[in-house]
From Swiss-Prot:
It comes from Ambrosia artemisiifolia (Common ragweed). The keyword Metal-binding does not apply. One of its GO terms (cellular component) is cell cortex. This is Profilin-3. The lineage of its organism: Eukaryota, Viridiplantae, Streptophyta, Embryophyta, Tracheophyta. Binds to actin and affects the structure of the cytoskeleton. At high concentrations, profilin prevents the polymerization of actin, whereas it enhances it at low concentrations. By binding to PIP2, it inhibits the formation of IP3 and DG.
Amino acid sequence: MSWQAYVDEHLMCDIEGTGHHLTSAAILGHDGTVWAQSSNFPQFKPEEMKGIITEFDQAGTLAPTGMFIAGAKYMVLQGEQGAVIRGKKGAGGICIKKTGQALVMGIYDEPVAPGQCNMVVERLGDYLIDQGM
């Protein structure tokens, strides 16, 4: 399966038969290289990706300033150190799951709930980890 198919079929999917979908999603390498993305995934800056990687390595570094994706500021919520970062921005948010080689990212807005986004992103991330990726 191609990386784009993972984004299209597993991240941008109908969530639990509700007819709701993530706003955008992507799979990236740890260096910030985009492997696959939805058509509307925001164009992030290299320094934003560096901040995300640092947060995975040293949890709490983004808490004082927030996490930025394409200039949009997300308040960093409790995640799982070294494995998951969750952020909130208004009625929406972001979930990022780190695997051995990739970052699986999902951005959502209402009516998608935070837990639904987390489930979709983390399920794919866990699958990739199980596959040695």
